[in-house]
Amino acid sequence: MNRPDSASIHRGVTTLKFTKTDLSGNTGSAVRFSAAGAGANSGLSFSNPNFGDSGHTTAAAMAENYKEFDKSDTSPIIPEIRIRTFSFRVREIILAVVSVVALIGCLVLIAIVATNSKSDENTSSEMSRQKAIRTLCTEASCLKAASYGVSNMNASVNPCDNFHQYACGNYPTLNPLDPDVSQRTIFWNLYYDNEDKLRTLLEATASRTSSWSSEKKLKDFFMSCIDDYGKMKTGGKAFIDKIIQPLGGWDVLNNFNAANFNLQTNLQKTSIDFWTASLFTFRVTTDRYDRTRRVIEVDMSGMGMSWAYFIRDTTQQIRNDYKKFMRTVAQLLAADSGLNLDQNILANKIQTFVDDAFDIEFQLANITANTVPTGDPHNHEKRITLTDLTQQTNNVVDFVSFFQYMFGSSNVNGNTRVILMEDDWIRRMLAMVGSIPDADKARKLSNYIIWVLAHTYVQELSWTYIHANRVFWADVYQFEDFWGTWHHCFWHADHSMPDALGSLFAKQHFKDKNKEKAEEIVRYIKQALIDSVDSNKFMDDTTKQRAKAKLTASTDKMGYPDIYMNDADIDNIYQQININRSDYFQNLLNLNLFDKQDWTRRLTTGEDRSRWLYNSYDTTMTFYNSWNQLLVPAGMLQFPVYEWTLPHYYNFGSMGGLMGHYLVHAIDNWGGSYNENGVYGKWYTNASTENYKKVEQCFSVAYDNKTMGPYKVVGQSAPQSVLVNGRRFAWEGLAETSGIRIAYKAYKKWIADNGEEKPTPTPHYTNDQSFFLAFAQTNCFTRTDALSYYYAQVQRLPEDVRTNTALSLLDEFTQAFNCPAGSAMNSVKKCDTF
């Protein structure tokens, strides 16, 4: 049986394996995974599934970590920046920037006055009315919005021919791609702006220095991680002392006694104390049939690279490179142990180690190739007690003892039912382990477990180990650049202490007024959507009432949790963690214990809807139907997507359009599978379901006529274009068009309640036009042809196709820009929307 390949990233190295994607927004896998070995294209993720891949590469410079050895014994309070032979103080640079901004503002105003004086006769009646009753907005926020909008536009394009090009035509020029960057989008830029802010926060001296301060613990952990000098002094000694020795030694180091080896003990220590998945993995997740409860899932694991690489005829060189990597790590550990052993004997032991570990992974790959995931694994009839699982697999692993070691005997017993995500795989794996000849079993399993741990922790050791990992990636994937110490350590801080980091970000970079105005916008949009349900043409009365009930009951999480403003609350979260600035490896093990305690709490307390699924600095947004919540982290509530000082037509067009899109997902065919309490179950009537299908078909036809490309493709003489599969995108197309229409209606209601605002000093544009420009400019992008072609092949539509198609179906847009019937931006056939 053939399986697709997918990636799961271990703490220190990317490990490719097959896995079922968990779309329920749950906790994830059993090990705290790290993308440190993910090579050049890994970048860094702020949980950004909706707004594109980061695609950014940062090559680490070791020198940055040795700045403490700067020979200067003094430094000015206001530092200098040198550019070739000139030097400038930061104050001088700031003054220069302010002067330039002021000059630009003056020039914009002069241009507006000059332009308006020449074109009164061409200005629309709406603009004339606005000019007659008020002046232009010349506040700093309006100048900022006007400057940003005009700079990204290509005004030579007719907006009724290609509105995205009109709104974003100059964006690629202003945002050129570096050689190691495959794309830049609005959200990509926000993401890296946030990263820069977080870097500054992490590297700053802690303002609260008490032993219980979460800020101090976070920064001490981060500084211990970037201490390359300390890691070079320690080498692999920490791994040998704190992992190999507690497991009973290692055959390569000549201190292993097969008679004392206990698989049960080794698996428990590996999976729980060292938080590394070996023969299998597990996770605490939400029960799909009762979302108030948490359950334990048991899943496949145990391979250091894609299962396909182990067995395909075309991947022999990859297998050779992998074995070379294993051998190198073993040699480094042997050298750091101070072992005094005959070199021939040592070489034989290392070869045995490589053969043992590789053979078990090879057998796991064969099992993977010949099994399939369990269908509907959460079905109550497919769940199994821990006692039955142990007995039915010949007691190879005592699962009762294993999970009691993890969660405690008071929380788990033999009658605890677990979910096998890969039932056939788990049983075959345990049968394989049980069939290993007794003469070799202890040594072979020990060698395998030591390799799994070494592979996981190699990125946490000195540069010699990291370089071995890097060589493997260069051999296999031709990526010589590595993301370096800073990104690796940031990843750890982000995943290990996200609330401490999120609190610092929210307090430093987010104002309460930002949150208040965003909540005002979402209230207007939600009400506009509720009002629109009444006039909906494809829902019957029963479905309309259910839709309105769900929207009324829905809540939102905007910006950040309230506890982020209370230091004591954040300190309390991390009170059990001990962090030593000079002992990075022990810090990792202490964080493993913290994760163990956190998972136990989650299993025993069940669902907690007060939790935030995103960090405050994430750049994403979604409607989480299982909790009936709109999630908008503070990382999204920033310019150019949103800023509280901007006019409402700007914020409603940009942020409001996104909010409208995701609120529609609360009541479309997808949201129609979850009721107002988040319980799974269809609430659309049969008649409404059939009518909804007709609406989707209209959007399918609208997108079927679109083309992605053309793109220059390596190996192809002519540029390649890809047709849009409208059927696959129809439900998103409906949300896209409905979202911007709902945002527009909400904006009009806000005007009715609060009055018109002054327009920005942008020539010729009414507030309505600025609204649609703001929407379009959240979708500006530039991307390599290679990545664009890949996206096109998997039917990930580019922003220009999405934007133009969505707006062409809106009468409100075509009226705002007076697009004639039959023009590209005025679709002849309009579709029903929410």
Spell out what each predicted region is.
Residues M1-T74:
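Intrinsically disordered, low-complexity cytosolic terminal tails
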Residues N116, A347, A357, Q363, ...:
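Intrinsically disordered, low-complexity linker/terminal regions across diverse proteins
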Residues S128-S151:
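Short, Gly/Pro- and small/polar-rich lid/capping loops
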Residues N152-L174, Y309-L332, A730, I740-I742:
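Hydrophobic/aromatic-rich, well-ordered segments within soluble, folded domains that form packed cores
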Residues K197-Y524, P561-Y564, N578-Y584, L588-F594:
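Noncatalytic, helix-rich "gating/capping" subdomain that lines the substrate-entry/channel surface
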Residues I93-R134:
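Alpha-helical transmembrane segments in eukaryotic/viral proteins
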Residues E64-I104, D321:
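Helix-loop boundary elements of multi-pass alpha-helical membrane proteins
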Residues C137, S141-C142, N158-D161, Y166-K237:
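Active-site-surrounding "flap" and adjacent substrate/cofactor-binding loops of secreted or lumenal enzymes
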